[in-house]
Regions:
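Helix-loop junctions on the outward
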Residues: 44-66
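Hydrophobic transmembrane alpha-helical segments in integral membrane proteins
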Residues: 1-15
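Transmembrane helix-loop junctions and nearby membrane-interface residues
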Residues: 46-53, 75-85, 110-113
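Mid-membrane cores of alpha-helical transmembrane segments in multi-pass membrane proteins
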Residues: 38-41, 67-77, 102
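Membrane-proximal helix-loop-helix units in multi-pass membrane proteins
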Residues: 81-115
Length: 115
């Protein structure tokens, strides 16, 4: 989480603006989607501040689950972004393996939710 809910709101706004600018510049989808994904993370953090210390409430549990799932799928976005920064040959050679490992990581994290 950021230092405060106000900082999270500011980062959410900056990130959303950056994602929209990137989208309108017609940057690769991996760029603007990653910026948008991290803006959504800031929104989850703002929601988390609203329910902090309210353990056991539906709202707290929902925000916590959404945050956990957000983290589980982060590797897909981070690596898609990174693959846009490397030469096409390297991207084409590695993307299947990279996303397979991301999928394995997400599966392990989601499996931990099973009681």
């Amino acid at each position: 989480m950021c230092w405060s809910s106000q900082v999270s709101v500011a980062m959410m706004g900056v990130g959303t603006a950056a994602a929209l600018i990137s989208y309108h510049r017609k940057d690769p989808a991996a760029i603007w989607l990653t910026l948008g994904y991290f803006s959504a993370m800031e929104a989850l953090q703002v929601a988390g501040y609203a329910v902090v210390d309210q353990c056991g409430t539906f709202e707290n549990r929902a925000v916590t689950l959404a945050s956990y799932l957000h983290i589980a799928f982060q590797p897909f976005l981070i690596n898609a972004f990174a693959l846009e920064l490397v030469p096409k040959a390297a991207k084409d050679r590695t993307k299947r393996w990279v996303f397979a490992v991301c999928g394995l990581s997400a599966a392990v994290m989601i499996a931990q939710l099973v009681p």
